C-alpha cells in the first residue's frame, strides 16, 4: 500500500497492510531539519521531509486558518491590518470599520523569520468584548467570497499533486466552533457567558457555527479529503464532560456533520487533557482524534482509550515527543515505540504519531529509530 492508501484505509475503519506512521511536522521542526532554507513551508517541505525519512504524511496546511473576513475588506467591512515586530514578538492588530462602529483584535506570537508562517498567535485584545460588538459583528460580517473559494480549490489541487501517494492533506479550517469563539472573545468570559448570559452565548456560538460550516463547506468542495478541526482550547483541563456536552458538543457536532455529509473525513486535534471527553468525541461523530497525549502534556492512556472508544473512532498519537523522544537512548525508543504500537494496532483504527508536532532539536537518529521500529512493529 502507499501512504495515501494506508491512511485512507484506516480512516474508513478498515485494516491496512501496516499502521500508518504519520508523524506531524511543521515549521518549527522543518526549520531545524532544513537549516539551509531561508524560509520553510509546512506543506512543500513536509513532503520533502517525508520522502527523506520515509514516513506516511498528513500535512496540516494553515492557508485557510484565518477567516476571509479578517484578511480583506468587503462592503461595510473595512479591514486594516498592522504588523509590528518588537523584542522577539510579532504583533498583529486588525481594525474593522463598519457603519455602526469599529471592531479591533490584537494578537501576538514569538517571531522567528525562517518559521514565520508557523507562528501561533495568542489574542491580547478581543474582537467581541461586549454585546454591542456582537451586534455589529452579526450584522456586517461578510459571507465567504468567490475569490477565497477559488483559492481553496487551487490549493487543494496543488496539494494533491505535490503529496501524491505519500499521504493526504488535512488542512486546518478556522478551528472548532469553541476554539474560534475563544479567539475573538476571552475564554474566561466565554465560559461564564454559558452560565450567566446564555442568550448572548447562544447567539454568538450559533453565528460562529454558521460561518465555520459555510467555510468548511467550501473546503470540502475541493480535492482535500480530510479537514482538521482544532479543539485544544475546550480540553479536559478547562471544561468537564457535562459542560462540554451541554454547551460545546452541539455546535461541534454540526460542524463535523457538515464535513462528513460532503464525503470528507474529520481530524479533531486536542493535544492536551481529554480523558473525560473521549466519549464526547464519539458523540460528535468524529473520524479521528489526535493526540492521545500522556502526562504531563495530557492525561490520556492509549490502552484505556482503545478499550473505551477505539472501535468507534481512529486514534492517533501517544508518543511523548517533549520529555521522552528528545532525550531517550535508541534502546529506550525501540522499547517504547514497540509498546505503543502493540497497543494501538489491535483492531485497527490507529495512526502512529507523537503527542503533537516534532520539536526542533530532536536528534535525527531518534526520529529515524521511531520510524524504523514503527514500520516494523506496525505490520498486520
Where are these regions (language model features)?
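Short alpha-helical segments and helix-capping/turn motifs at coil-helix boundaries
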Residues: 3-8, 43, 76-81, 89-92, ...
Amino acid at each position: 500500500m502507499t501512504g495515501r492508501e494506508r491512511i485512507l484505509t484506516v480512516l474508513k475503519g478498515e485494516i491496512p497492510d501496516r499502521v500508518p506512521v504519520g508523524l506531524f511536522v511543521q515549521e518549527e521542526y522543518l526549520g531545524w531539519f532544513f537549516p539551509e532554507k531561508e524560509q520553510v513551508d509546512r506543506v512543500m517541505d513536509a513532503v520533502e521531509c517525508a520522502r527523506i525519512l520515509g514516513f506516511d504524511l498528513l500535512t496540516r496546511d494553515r492557508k485557510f486558518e484565518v477567516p476571509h473576513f479578517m484578511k480583506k475588506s468587503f462592503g461595510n467591512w473595512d479591514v486594516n491590518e498592522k504588523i509590528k515586530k518588537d523584542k522577539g514578538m510579532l504583533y498583529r492588530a486588525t481594525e474593522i470599520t463598519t457603519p455602526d462602529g469599529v471592531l479591533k483584535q490584537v494578537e501576538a506570537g514569538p517571531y522567528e523569520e525562517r518559521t514565520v508562517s508557523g507562528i501561533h498567535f495568542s489574542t491580547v485584545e478581543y474582537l467581541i468584548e461586549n454585546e454591542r460588538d456582537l451586534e455589529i459583528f452579526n450584522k456586517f460580517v461578510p459571507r465567504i467570497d468567490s475569490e477565497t473559494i477559488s483559492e481553496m480549490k487551487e490549493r487543494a489541487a496543488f496539494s494533491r499533486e505535490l503529496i501524491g501517494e505519500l499521504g493526504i492533506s488535512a488542512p486546518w479550517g478556522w478551528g472548532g466552533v469553541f476554539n474560534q469563539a475563544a479567539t475573538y472573545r476571552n475564554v474566561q468570559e466565554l465560559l461564564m457567558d454559558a452560565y450567566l448570559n446564555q442568550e448572548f452565548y447562544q447567539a454568538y456560538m450559533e453565528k460562529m457555527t454558521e460561518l465555520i460550516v459555510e467555510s468548511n463547506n467550501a473546503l470540502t468542495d475541493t480535492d482535500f479529503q480530510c479537514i482538521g478541526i482544532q479543539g485544544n482550547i475546550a480540553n479536559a483541563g478547562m471544561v468537564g464532560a457535562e459542560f462540554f456536552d451541554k454547551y460545546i458538543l452541539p455546535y461541534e457536532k454540526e460542524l463535523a456533520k457538515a464535513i462528513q455529509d460532503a464525503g470528507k473525513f474529520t481530524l479533531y486535534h486536542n493535544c492536551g487533557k481529554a480523558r473525560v471527553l473521549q466519549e464526547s468525541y464519539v458523540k460528535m461523530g468524529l473520524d479521528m482524534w489526535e493526540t492521545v497525549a500522556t502526562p504531563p502534556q495530557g492525561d490520556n492512556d492509549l490502552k484505556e482509550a482503545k478499550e473505551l472508544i477505539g472501535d468507534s473512532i481512529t486514534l492517533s498519537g501517544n508518543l511523548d515527543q517533549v520529555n521522552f523522544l528528545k532525550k531517550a537512548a535508541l534502546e529506550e525508543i525501540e522499547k517504547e515505540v514497540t509498546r505503543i504500537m502493540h497497543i494501538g494496532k489491535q483492531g485497527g483504527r490507529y495512526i502512529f504519531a507523537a503527542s503533537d508536532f516534532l520539536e526542533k532539536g530532536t536528534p535525527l537518529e531518534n526520529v529515524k529509530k521511531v520510524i524504523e521500529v514503527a514500520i516494523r512493529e506496525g505490520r498486520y
